[in-house]
């Protein structure tokens, strides 16, 4: 089981060393969505990594489960100032999914069912930092929380953990996704308060 903790000590008066600046702890898990909630069943869900040459590496639900699901306990931090600590997740590490992907790109665009996009540096998805999550707190992800599968990138603000994930497309240069086009920071590190431009 992977246990991730991004804390670096008390920063600017935070009462909890695991709480980034400007964040407030919550016990519940707020639902925030930019649009309508897609209804995608696990039987119809697919996920693709597309390289800059157009080569596609794809998985359906069963194939994803066979890659190797792992347990993760981590903190999540939303740009709207809430944090939830010690969330239990199950998912597949992107390290496993990228094993056979050949690319010279440094950036990706994550695409979701419903049209949502978010950009990330490839380095933020590898080395045990990101997963395709299928469960949270011991239950399958509900549609409201991105089910059947969402990206989980807990070291960045939670808008980078795209719900209803369907594709990661490699990009040679950084391009803004949905929220990034609307004033959100290109990277979104909560410890640096990278909320907006």
Where are these regions (language model features)?
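Structured, non-membrane catalytic/scaffold regions adjacent to prosthetic-group chemistry
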Residues: 2-197
